[in-house]
């Protein structure tokens, strides 16, 4: 907002014309005029040619179990076609699980620690559950927040910038969600992936020695 960016969430695009977008939200229809329009509509699975297999569908893709097995014997699926997470790093891990299962190696796919990154300036990254999801599910949780400006390294490298580290924990004090706004969020999010995958607790994170000075120190400091 400080940079003049305006967000319209929970909205549906109805029509696009030269220099104009018509969209609707809970309050009705609206129009936005602009000299440029960037269309980012995502992807959808290509299922052409596999109709004869009669695979059980899931959303717009193919249903798989935690071993990436489909409803048909000796058929596995991985990547965007599973309709879980349309991200390259998710597809890589799904492919590993599928191949390991084919070879009889015990492996299982988990989706509780899939990182997502917006490569903007400043960067935004998140891993695990969000506070909104926990509220909707009625689960007990605790929020830990700290401004990125508590990190001297962040202040030195992002002059005049600000950011936020937000960590969510469950009633067992396990890390279940971690979210960053500010550079270098895309690099720091790997720490969140490890913490959530390993089901680390607040006490365990606090015992980790982070190098100083680094922006990643903010993770431990947020939990102090």
Outline where the language-model segments fall.
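N-terminal glycine-rich dinucleotide-binding loop that anchors FAD/FMN and/or NAD(P) in oxidoreductases
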Residues: 1-11, 126-133
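General small-molecule cofactor/ligand-binding pocket signal
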Residues: 6-8, 76, 142-144
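A conserved short coil-to-beta-strand element within the FAD-binding core of flavoproteins
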Residues: 9-20
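Glycine-centered tight beta-turn/hairpin loop motif at sheet-sheet or coil-to-beta transitions
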Residues: 26-29
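FAD-site-proximal beta/loop scaffold in flavoenzymes
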Residues: 31-103
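Short beta-strand and adjoining strand-loop segment in the mid-core
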Residues: 81-87, 117-124
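Internal hydrophobic alpha-helix adjacent to the cofactor/substrate pocket in enzyme cavities
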Residues: 89-112, 140, 198-199
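Flexible, glycine-rich terminal cap/loop adjacent to redox cofactors
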Residues: 103, 120-130, 135-224
